[in-house]
Amino acid sequence: MNKALRQKKIRELVENNDVSGQQELLGMLEKEGFSVAQPTLSRDFAEMGIVRNRTADGGYRLSVPEEPQEDILRGLVGMEVLSITANETSIIINTLPGRAHGVGSFLDRINSPEILGTIAGDDTVLVIPATIRKISSVKSYIQKILSQP
C-alpha cells in the first residue's frame, strides 16, 4: 500500500466526517479497502499533525491542520540550504547545522518520481535519484523547488 495514498485517504475521511478516534477511522479505512495497523495509523497521525479535539457536546473529533502554504514552506526550507552539488551518481545538499533532516523530509514529502529517497545527517542531505541518467535534471529540479541558484 502506498503511504501517500493512505495518508490522502485519511485526510479526506477526517475532513469530511465526524471521526471520534483511531478505532472509528480504522473501520472507515477498512471499508474503503485500506488494511492499516493501529501503530501505522498512529505514525500517520503524528506525521500529518492530526489531533483529537473536544467538541461542544463533550465528545471528541479528529482534525487535520491546514496544509501549510507551499510557497512559504519552500522559502523557509530554501533558506536552510547552503549549496547543492552533484556527481555522476548522487546529489549532495549542504544545509545549516541541524537542518538537514528538515530539508530531507521536505524533499521526501514532495513524492517526486525523480527522487528515490534521501538520507539526512546533521548538515548534509544525500539525495538518491531514481536514475543516474537524469542527475542534472534532478539537481535542477531541486534547485528550482528550493529557489537555489
Curated annotation (Swiss-Prot):
Superkingdom classification of source: Bacteria
InterPro entries, per the entry: Arg_repress (IPR001669), Arg_repress_C (IPR020899), Arg_repress_C_sf (IPR036251), Arg_repress_DNA-bd (IPR020900), WH-like_DNA-bd_sf (IPR036388), WH_DNA-bd_sf (IPR036390)
Membership in a protein family: Belongs to the ArgR family.
Signal peptide: none
Gene3D superfamilies associated with the record: 3.30.1360.40, Winged helix-like DNA-binding domain superfamily/Winged helix DNA-binding domain
Function description: Regulates arginine biosynthesis genes.
Protein name, entry field: Arginine repressor
Gene Ontology molecular functions: arginine binding; DNA binding; DNA-binding transcription factor activity
Lineage: Bacteria, Pseudomonadati, Chlorobiota, Chlorobiia, Chlorobiales
UniProt source species: Chlorobaculum parvum (strain DSM 263 / NCIMB 8327) (Chlorobium vibrioforme subsp. thiosulfatophilum)
GO biological process, one term: regulation of arginine biosynthetic process
GO CC terms, sorted: cytoplasm
Location relative to the cell: Cytoplasm
Pfam families in the record: Arg_repressor, Arg_repressor_C
Keywords: Amino-acid biosynthesis, Arginine biosynthesis, Cytoplasm, DNA-binding, Repressor, Transcription, Transcription regulation
